[in-house]
Amino acid sequence: MADSDDEYDRKRRDKFRGERDSYRTERRDDRRPVGGSAGARDEWAERNPFRGAASAGGGGARHRPDYSDYRGPGARPRYGSPGRDLPPAKRMRPDWGDGDVRANPRFGGYDPYLMQAWNDHYQSMHSAYSHAGHAPPVRESIGGGGSDTLTQPAMLNLKQFLDTQDENISDSEVMRKYTDYKTDFKRQQLNEFFVAHKDEEWFKNKYHPEDSVKRNEEQRGFLQRRTDVFMELLENGTIGSVKVDSSQADALIRVLDTCVIKLEGGTDEDLKVLDEKPKDPVVYERKAEPMQSVKEVEKTINSPKDEISEADPLPAVVSTQRKPVGPVNSDEENWDDDNDAENSTPKKELAEDSKDSDSKPEEKQLNKKKTKKRKRNSSDDDSSSSESSSSSDEEKLKEKYDVEDGLRTEQKIEAEKDRQEATKAKQEPQSPKLDEVEGNDTTEPKGLDSKINTVEIDDTLKSPEISSNPIKNTDNGDSSKVEEDEEKPSVGKDKVVETETIDLDKVKDCQPRALHRTSSIFLRNLAPSITRSEIEAMCNRFTGYLRVAIADPLVERRWYRRGWITFMRDVNIKEICWGLNNQRLRDCEMGAIVNRDLSRRVRPANGITAHKQVVRSDIKLCAKIALNLDEKFRLWAEVPKDDPNSARANESSENGSGSTYGFNSQNPVLQNITDYLIEEASAEEEELLGLTGENKDTEGEPIERDEQLISVLDRLVLYLRIVHSVDYYNHCEYPYEDEMPNRCGIIHARGPPPVRVTNNDVQEYIKMYETKLQQFLTKTVPLSDEEIKNLGAKDAETEVEKFVQANTQELAKDKWLCPLSGKKFKGPEFIRKHIFNKHEEKVDEVRKEVQYFNNYLRDPKRPQLPEHPGTSKRPESESARGGGGGYRPPMYPPFSAMPYGFGPPMMGGGRGGRNFPPARRELPLEHQRRLIGYHDLDAPANSDMFD
């Protein structure tokens, strides 16, 4: 019974243990057994500093403090009415927001949330912000403790600002001071944001006087290149032969791919790759028997018929200039070991063939053999040991990564026939040239010449692989052999080498390059401090790297950015992605993942866009957008720039007058555009025949297509999409597309038209579409000098004067110091002269900093932190509660309805003195709901009630 009574006593006394712990300075959890059933409470014994050694064991004697310790000092009867010495009211959790979190000082504890809020409030009102300044910087939003969104500090409303002013102040003076306060608040936020981000690359590219000019010129170069490609396609009829309809998706994709190949520097010969069937679906299928494909590859390599063609690169996928991926951060375990096993056999065979073909070696070749014998022996030893140790690993890797084996097998089988035919066709016209060149050389037979030529072509084409894989070449002994075989024909057969070099160029020209297809990696996390040069330096170690694109930072992501790294199509993108995931930049995990190819490149828009009335409206909108964007980047401004009349006409066209389209722009797409903007209707005929539009409004009319208008619109839509990266039917712009993996990836086209459409639907659609395109229709005008002056613009000479004063220090009488150089002068005027003469670059930096800041202020769409939710939208009940302080959302309930006995000496009956309305006086004990009953709410507080 003792154990059961003890357990019952423990449960009864510890019923409110969790509530008491937050009121006391020390924890009273030593009453819990250490070895109890609750696993989470096992560590409580280690937290109690007052527990003795006896309590460490489960059965030892435990210190049991008297239960009266929880009640404070003094004796207290166990039974009877508690009177006014009640325990505190039940404490609600702070995150509920509707309970009283104040601690009762009787229990010796305090609430950290309450005191922290009071300290912040007291310091903000009486020390740093006593002159009605700004609130302490609060970067979190109201709702949320877990939100990562950055916001500005909450600004005081008029009522809160009035509490900080003198009582005798007039209304006009209050309004003037409050206006100044809001202006200063905005200036401070802009200045803080500028100081926080001025050293980041994305910010410099926007506003720095030097970096922004370079970036704008780079973008203008991209646009000029796109314009040249578009004009080339417009002249050869490629643009006019396609309609921007979803039914012509293949033709649209071909036009976009043609643009990409041209932008990448491709030729008309490279465009032939668009006629070939795509082989990607075959590449990504996993073979059931991977070892069989390897055997087939070895058969094709060992066959004597294929000696000429087996060393050629694959024309459909790999060009002669491309290099395979070199292993990154891998010593022995590489994903491409199976490729090395395949590539080692043809290299050795080629070396043997070249040795047999060279029947008359010269003295120089013998000397070179002697010098390279050591390298060959050492490399052969290394390769033999490495091959024997990693043979089992290679078999496993071949079974796992058999995609590349299947790719090589199928591509080589398909490409062998084409290569044989190409070599036969080329050897026939070139044979007389070879005879003419080698007419004087009678010692070598022709069959030997052809054999040497074959070896020369093979070695030349394989040289990129050798140079791109230095790690693999050191493990295998093939590199020295191949290098030796390359040098043999170059010593004795100089004339033959020259002839074969010309032939090799012709072979390369005949191979179309799929420049429109790339592989890419998506970087989910890029810190704002990471620069483009750092990413490029990291990616340049990987073979096949092309470019990198970095998006603008977003405030929702705490100014973190996203990035896309583009590589050639034939690289092992998964291995590169694995290598990037093992690296960190500035202690930032980039989160690299493989970027998939685009699934749907042509996406349908509303079919009502094919209606004649909608098409005419779209032509007008497209012309406006093209004019604004052309002038923004000065694409067609070379000729009319010197003519004041044309410049004046351009200004009128920007203001929206449609009569100027095509007359002032040198853009051929906009020539004579006004002829298609004038509506035509048979109004007289309808009036004479008594036709009305009532039936059309109720039943609707069928879609009317005007092919001439549609052809004009399609030319404008493709111009916006190719040149300015504006997808008109998606009313959006694809930014930094020239640096993205897909330069012309997605386009929206007209979808299937509906059967009938009403006039109301047409008008609503036109109005809605014009609203969505407003960002392109309105011209972005920088702020004037007067406007940026109100925002806190700086003056260059004033800042230079401040810089001089800051670097002029008086040490003693007639003794002044310049901190920049450490020299001492007799007067400040000498320091000024010294700074302007010897530290002119520092003065120029100050002037650039001023221009940097003013450029940021001039941008009407400048990035900045969003307003605090408490500033723009405040709760209606905040003023009624008489609390909050205006600096941050209250983390605790108002001061009214406090439990009996609460009264910190500092706070008294109000909130920090006269600046806040006094709190309601404390209510008597009867309002703590000890007894439940009804009474008149309007009655006095001390009215008689039943006890």
Curated annotation (Swiss-Prot):
The modification Phosphothreonine is found at T300. Interacts with cbp20, Dcr-2 and pasha. Residues 330-341 have a biased composition (Acidic residues). The modification Phosphoserine is found at S81, S303, S330, S354, S357, S431, S646. PANTHER family: ARSENITE-RESISTANCE PROTEIN 2, SERRATE RNA EFFECTOR MOLECULE HOMOLOG. InterPro entries: SE/Ars2, SERRATE/Ars2_C, SERRATE/Ars2_N. Residues 8-33, 40-49, 285-308, 345-366, 393-427, 478-493 have a biased composition (Basic and acidic residues). Acts as a mediator between the cap-binding complex (CBC) and RNA-mediated gene silencing (RNAi). Involved in innate immunity via the short interfering RNAs (siRNAs) processing machinery by restricting the viral RNA production. Also involved microRNA (miRNA)-mediated silencing by contributing to the stability and delivery of primary miRNA transcripts to the primary miRNA processing complex containing drosha and pasha. Belongs to the ARS2 family. Keywords: Nucleus, Phosphoprotein, RNA-mediated gene silencing. Its main location: nucleus. One of its GO terms (cellular component) is nucleoplasm. The gene is Ars2. It comes from the Eukaryota. This is Serrate RNA effector molecule homolog. GO terms for biological process: defense response to Gram-negative bacterium; negative regulation of viral genome replication; primary miRNA processing; regulatory ncRNA-mediated post-transcriptional gene silencing; siRNA processing. Residues 1-100, 285-493, 643-666, 855-890 are annotated as: Disordered.
